[in-house]
Design a protein with these regions (language model features):
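Transmembrane alpha-helical interface segments in multi-pass membrane proteins
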Residues: 331-334, 344, 351-398, 427-428, ...
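Internal alpha-helical transmembrane segments of multipass membrane proteins
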Residues: 23, 321-342
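Mechanotransmission and gating elements of multispan inner-membrane complexes involved in transport
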Residues: 92, 212-321
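Short helix-to-coil transition segments within interhelical loops
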Residues: 11, 358-365, 443, 452-453
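Hydrophobic, regular-secondary-structure patches
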Residues: 36-131, 137-138, 142, 154-180, ...
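Hydrophobic secondary-structure segments that place a key small or acidic residue at a functional site
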Residues: 106-116, 126-257
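Short helix-loop junctions at transmembrane helix boundaries
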Residues: 384-424, 434-447
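Short, strongly hydrophobic transmembrane alpha-helices
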Residues: 17-41
Length: 453
């Protein structure tokens, strides 16, 4: 007696019920698999994104906000910090590399980041990987031009403050022309989604998010001079400009810092300028906590470890993942109950068939196995379809995810937990079929073979 042929026949006889219950199992498994893939993929990408960012320094506020703004081009900047602090860090013997960033504009939603050529020449966004050009060159940078831009921005700020107080304003002298002031190097995703090409000009809008009310800097168009190769990090979704050009445009006037430094940190030299944040790479990890404490003891700046902040973030959102996973398990449980009810309801129609099998020599254990195997088969097929479906859904969504975030989730990677999900489906099928199987086991042969009156 071939049990699988009998099980297949029974499933075909109840095709609609089998399809509905199997689909319920598939949906539950697909949801669970998709949640696991997305969680692991997003967490892995976020953690990889911090590899080149050993320490981030910015204005006092939320460390997580600072990390999201600097490393991932998300959220808004907590504020500005002193350029003198950057110079101090750059000259610190414990610091291997210091890279300044200034933000405040966007082009079609892509963050515009003011920085120096150090970002392209020395910065590694991952160990051993620097931003590489697919076309063109990097922008020209000269520190003298940056200091001139700082002075110009400070003069504009003083003029604005004088106007606000109703004082007579003496126009500042026209700044000296700067060679190649408005050059930009764009990430691969920016080039792909905006259609910008090498040598093309574009006009930025004020603010880090696109808005219909945002003022466009029509007087200062930037020229694309370079396009970066894909990195599958936030670098792909950014536009990098010369830091001095950032302060040449209106709306980026230099104002007084929001918090003064400690008295012992003050000197008679005026602060030449400000930046949004500084990324620091240390000569050795042993210097990390010492410098971290020094920066956080200041009243005008704070330091954050991106890797630690991202771990905290996923500790928080992990509760949401567990809730979604619990919902997926609940769907599986409901599907299991539906399987049990479906088979149980069909037992009244199948009692005579079972009695005939018994009369032909089938043992009680064989009948029990047939019903139990039917429930397990429905769950296994549904779970297998759900497993494949979960991966297909994530793979199909990767196109949208890449456009929105610049990275993709490895949809073909099978996690260990997925095999546990399949095991749970088998156990669930066995439990679902246990009640109907016991009913079949106890079927009275004589009564069910007797002719109905």
């Amino acid at each position: 007696m071939n049990l699988f042929k009998i099980v297949t026949k029974n499933m075909r006889q109840r095709a609609l019920a089998t399809w509905l219950t199997g689909t319920s199992v598939a949906l539950g498994v697909a949801l669970a698999v998709a949640i696991l893939l997305i969680k692991q993929g997003v967490q892995q990408r976020f953690e990889q994104g911090t590899l080149g960012y050993e320490m981030v320094i910015g204005a006092k506020g939320s460390p997580l906000q600072l990390v999201l703004n600097t490393v991932y081009n998300l959220d808004i900047s907590p504020g500005n910090i002193s350029w003198k602090l950057f110079e101090k860090l750059r000259d610190d013997k414990r610091v291997k590399l210091a890279v300044p960033f200034s933000v405040g504009d966007n082009y079609h939603g892509f963050r515009i980041v003011g920085t120096t050529d150090t970002f392209f020449k020395d910065f590694e966004f991952e160990p051993g990987r620097k931003p590489e050009l697919a076309a063109g060159r990097i922008f020209n940078f000269k520190e003298d031009a940056l200091k001139s831009a700082f002075q110009e921005a400070a003069e504009r700020a003083r003029e604005r403050e004088s106007k606000e107080r109703g004082e007579e304003v003496t126009p500042a002298p026209e700044p000296a022309p700067v060679e190649h002031p408005f050059e930009a190097v764009i990430g691969s995703t920016v080039a792909e989604q905006t259609g910008l090409t090498n040598g093309e000009k574009f006009i930025a809008a004020h603010g880090v998010q696109p808005s219909a009310e945002a003022k466009e800097h029509t007087e200062n168009p930037w020229t694309v001079v370079g396009i970066l190769k894909p990195t599958h990090t936030a670098v792909d979704r950014a536009i990098y400009i010369n830091l001095d050009s950032f302060y040449h445009i209106e709306g980026h006037e230099l104002r007084s810092p929001t918090a003064a430094a400690k008295p012992e940190e003050k000197d008679n030299d005026p602060d030449p300028g400000q930046v949004s944040s500084i990324v620091v790479k240390l000569q050795s990890p042993i210097f990390a906590f010492g410098l971290y404490r020094e920066i956080n003891d200041r009243e005008d700046a704070m330091a954050a470890f991106p890797a630690a902040e991202i771990r905290k973030l996923f500790d928080i959102v992990g509760n949401i993942d567990r809730l979604l996973l619990a919902q997926a398990i609940l769907i599986l449980v409901v599907a299991g109950v539906a399987i049990a009810v479906s088979i149980y309801n069909s037992m009244s129609e199948r009692r005579r068939e079972i009695a005939i099998l018994r009369a032909l020599g089938a043992r009680r254990a064989t009948i029990f196995s047939i019903v139990l195997l039917e429930a397990v088969t429905i769950c296994v097929i549904g779970a297998a379809v759900g497993l494949v479906g979960g991966h297909l859904v994530v793979g199909a969504a990767n196109g949208l995810l890449y456009k929105a975030s610049g990275f993709v989730i490895p949809a073909l990677h099978v996690q260990t937990l997925e095999w546990y999900i399949l095991a749970v489906a088998v156990i669930l099928g066995a439990i679902s079929g246990l009640g109907p199987a016991l009913g079949a086991y106890r079927t009275d042969v004589a009564r069910n073979l007797a002719p109905s009156s």
